[in-house]
Amino acid sequence: MTQEIYEYANKIERALRNLPEYKKVVAAKEDIEKDSEASNIFEEFFKLQAKLKEMIQNGQTPSNEEQETIHQLSSKIESNELLKAYFEAQQSLSVYINDIERIIFNPLKDLI
């Protein structure tokens, strides 16, 4: 039985990789990597996201300057078609991820 659960998990992984939505995210990321402007904005976004996550974990809130940086970066993302396509594809894929997560963790609710 223990081995079986890992087999199911691996099947889910393979199924996710075969989803058209997953493939769209992969293709969108490849397009970003080919474009230096989009790639720079993309990298900047993930650095800022990590910084904000750390701040929140430490109970800090972004300063006015940091909030302005967030706003400017959001505008850059919205105006870049490659980045917009990537985040839209991510959003479509996240529907599956959220549903799968809900299904997997549903039995754990019984333990609380």
From Swiss-Prot:
SUPFAM superfamilies: YheA/YmcA-like. It holds the Pfam family Com_YlbF. Transmembrane segments: none annotated. The lineage of its organism: Bacteria, Bacillati, Bacillota, Bacilli, Lactobacillales. This is UPF0342 protein SUB0718. Coiled coil: none annotated. Belongs to the UPF0342 family. InterPro entries: Com_YlbF (IPR010368), YheA/YmcA-like_dom_sf (IPR023378). It comes from the Bacteria.
